[in-house]
Amino acid sequence: VEGVTMEEMLRAARTAARIASSGKAGKSVGLTEKTITKSRYAVTEPWEDVSVKAKIPYLEKLNEKIFSLDNRVRKVQASLSDSTSHVLFCNSEGVSYYDYRPMVSFMAVCIMEENGKMENGYAGRSYRKGFEFMTDDIVDIIAREAVDKTAILFKAVKPKGGEMPVVMGAGGSGILLHEAIGHAFEADFNRKRTSLFCDLL
């Protein structure tokens, strides 16, 4: 589809339907110009109306704030990205829905040095909000978090090697288990006999 007018989208839908049906007769759906629109995100300053020049000061503030929090900071990598999506859903009942989706990601990587040892930490926030998201408070939150995450790494010690019991709580532990052994239980790996568990299932 090279355009987003109703006529162009209907033409694309008909083409897709012909391909999917492979010549078989299917049920026709009549789409109307009526589209249901709901404001799901309370945006007061759309990103489309914000210039690059207006965004740069927040990157500069974040950079300066991180350097001011700890004299061990050697480098800061700050980034700000925004996007806006206009999505149109059409269902088999002939009803269409329009969705406006703003997105902003504001983040920083802090690199620190202590006694010749370098560490880095990351912090950021992503929201479906407009430019109103950019405040001095969010700058302070991200800066402090990036510095704290980096500073604590200098206190880290290497764990002992070998087998040991692991105690996991509810929540993210499921992801840890999946990444540790879950993939090896998947059918493809056992069918191809590339899994350690292929003879145990």
Segments from the language model and where they lie:
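Active-site bordering "gate/hinge" segments
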Residues: 1-201
